[in-house]
């Protein structure tokens, strides 16, 4: 149950492709992330696709903003040994950063959510899997992409489901929603 959320909007150019718009999105992201990291607040970042999730997570990891946490070292090593030594997710997990999307193995997806809920991961970059039966909440929700898939814009219902993951009852009484772009207009049933 959402208690209260502060919404803050950040400009993203309306024309152009994702590469052009990502200049604005990344500027916005790296404007707010240092404060969030300093306050050690749980944060979820919504992106429209598994590919975008991996790219945004890699940008955060490469920024050097996150210190090594030494909490998930065993998991990181296991991922490197089991999947690939250079898997960015394996390295990110050691810094309290991970991603979540429907293409991950189910057991790994569940473990990532569990670690996030236990605050062993501080930043979770994810797709709409966040609103599809994943039980988690965060102090901050960053809506990086304003589309659900491809170019299909978020509708008001989906936007509210995603932003509603911030500021949950008995955990974070006031959440923060950072929106890169504009809030979708509500669709009235009449």
Locate the predicted segments by residue.
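Post-DEXD/H (motif II) to motif III coupling segment of the RecA-like Helicase ATP-binding lobe
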Residues: 1-3
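Conserved C-terminal RecA-like helicase domain
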Residues: 13-16, 20-125, 148-160
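Conserved nucleotide-binding/hydrolysis micro-motifs of P-loop NTPases
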Residues: 49-53, 105, 130-132, 147-149, ...
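A short acidic (Asp/Glu
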Residues: 54-58, 134-138, 153, 188-189
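Glycine-centered flexibility sites
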Residues: 96, 102, 119, 133, ...
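SF2 helicase motor core recognition
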Residues: 109-114, 124-141, 164-173
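Conserved segment of the helicase C-terminal RecA-like domain
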Residues: 140, 146-190
